Regions:
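NAD(P)-dinucleotide binding in Rossmann-like oxidoreductases
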Residues: 5, 211-218, 228-246
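Hydrophobic residues in well-ordered beta-strands that form the structural core
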Residues: 15, 55, 95, 120-122, ...
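Rossmann-fold dehydrogenase core element
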Residues: 108-126, 146-148
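Core-facing hydrophobic residues within beta-strands of well-ordered domains
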Residues: 3, 29-31, 67, 147, ...
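Beta-loop-alpha module in the N-terminal Rossmann-like domain of NAD(P)-dependent dehydrogenases
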Residues: 38, 49-112
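N-terminal Rossmann-like dinucleotide-binding module
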Residues: 1-49
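Predominantly a Rossmann-like dinucleotide-binding segment in NAD(P)-dependent oxidoreductases
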Residues: 126-214
Length: 246
């Protein structure tokens, strides 16, 4: 089996707790270099996980001949920059969701991937978890009957520090960094799972609002959409719900 040597751009929570550990545990995969603009953060991460190299410059990591592929685990505002950098260097990349902070950047990433022939994957790993594989099986074998309509209803109370000011606010509610609010962080997985079950969403309408005014980004979203299969769907997300929504 060919071994893939990964380079990480970003040394935050995603690489520490969520996806990062798996890169060193899957057969044929290992992490050989990490990068963070914060030198201490990069060095300590590398030491903690026994990784040989660390960088503070993304281009240097991408240019490292020992690195075969790139995992991009930074906030969405930099996804396009790093993904395009990797693809232009001939290195496939795996990008945390959302793919980018705005639609235009998503188009740029797709265009560069087509031009270079280098793939760029989004971290929609949940579709491969056993639970969701079982759901897919139940839908496809007819156990659940004919699916006529799909609904998403999500509500959660505000998180700690959501009403903080300036740089103390979570980056996930700062549009210049995240692209939007928590919707950008949480909804992609839900919509991806539905698309795996019912085909691509071919038409959609969304209605964002800011109800609580705790931060600049939207905190409530309503949407309607239709899948490739013809099944209609609707959804609502509220990130400033009552405490009972926990």
């Amino acid at each position: 089996m060919k071994r893939i040597n990964w380079g990480f751009i970003g040394c935050g929570e995603a690489t520490e707790k969520k996806s990062g550990p798996a890169f060193g545990e899957v057969p044929g995969s290992q992490v050989v270099a990490v990068m963070s603009r914060n030198a201490d953060k990069a060095r300590l991460y590398a030491e903690r996980h026994h990784i040989r190299k660390w960088y503070t410059d993304a281009q240097e990591l991408v240019d490292d001949p020992d690195v075969d592929a790139i995992y991009i685990a930074t906030p969405p505002s930099s996804h396009a920059t790093f993904a395009i950098m990797a693809m232009r260097s001939g290195k496939p990349c795996y990008v945390e969701k959302p793919l980018a902070a705005c639609y235009e950047d998503c188009l740029r990433i797709n265009r560069i991937s087509e031009q270079t022939g280098v793939p760029c994957f989004v971290a929609y790993y949940r579709r491969y978890l056993p639970y969701f594989q079982k759901v897919k099986e139940l839908v496809e074998d007819g156990t659940l009957g004919k699916i006529l309509n799909v609904q998403i209803r999500f509500s959660a109370p505000p998180r700690e520090f959501d009403n903080a000011q300036g740089s103390n606010q979570p980056w996930r509610v700062q549009p210049l960094i995240a692209g939007g609010g928590y919707f950008y962080d949480l909804a992609p997985h839900q919509l991806d799972l539905l698309q795996q079950l019912f085909g691509f969403i071919i038409r959609a309408h969304g209605y964002p609002a800011n109800r609580a005014h705790l931060y600049q980004a939207e905190d409530t979203i309503s949407a309607s959409f239709i899948f490739q299969s013809g099944i209609p769907g609707s959804a609502s997300w509220c990130f400033v719900g009552h405490e009972s929504a926990k």
